[in-house]
Amino acid sequence: MATINQLVRKPRKRKAKTSDVRALEACPQRRGVCTRVYTTTPKKPNSALRKVCRVRLTNGFEVSSYIGGEGHNLQEHSVVLIRGGRVKDLPGVRYHTVRGALDTSGVNDRKRGRSKYGTKRPK
């Protein structure tokens, strides 16, 4: 325990909080190229085949990114936009691909919550 005199001379330092999405480097989104597109299984107690892609970002980071929505058109060398946002039941997946941006198509036949899936308004 520090004495009051020691604290007067040198106050306590605040611990700096590190970001959960460090690869974005304080940007809202980042562009990258898919290096691998695959499915993976979630943690217990959930069961599914979650669509994930490994992305090499323009700043040199390589991260795993979740592909939301039903069906996608991504393959290796697709250019994608990623945003922050982890997937709780997939360890190590801390980013989401933005649907409807760059090479990623929007979700077909989506009627509600379209803005989150890059779908145009149906006629």
From Swiss-Prot:
InterPro entries in alphabetical order: NA-bd_OB-fold, Ribosomal_uS12, Ribosomal_uS12_bac
Record has Transferase as a keyword: no
**Which Gene3D superfamilies does the UniProt entry name for this protein?**
Nucleic acid-binding proteins (2.40.50.140)
Q: Does the keyword RNA-binding apply?
A: yes
Which UniProt keyword terms apply here? Methylation, Ribonucleoprotein, Ribosomal protein, RNA-binding, rRNA-binding, tRNA-binding
Q: Which family does it belong to?
A: Belongs to the universal ribosomal protein uS12 family.
> What quaternary arrangement does the UniProt entry report?
Part of the 30S ribosomal subunit. Contacts proteins S8 and S17. May interact with IF1 in the 30S initiation complex.
Protein name, entry field: Small ribosomal subunit protein uS12
The organism is Teredinibacter turnerae (strain ATCC 39867 / T7901)
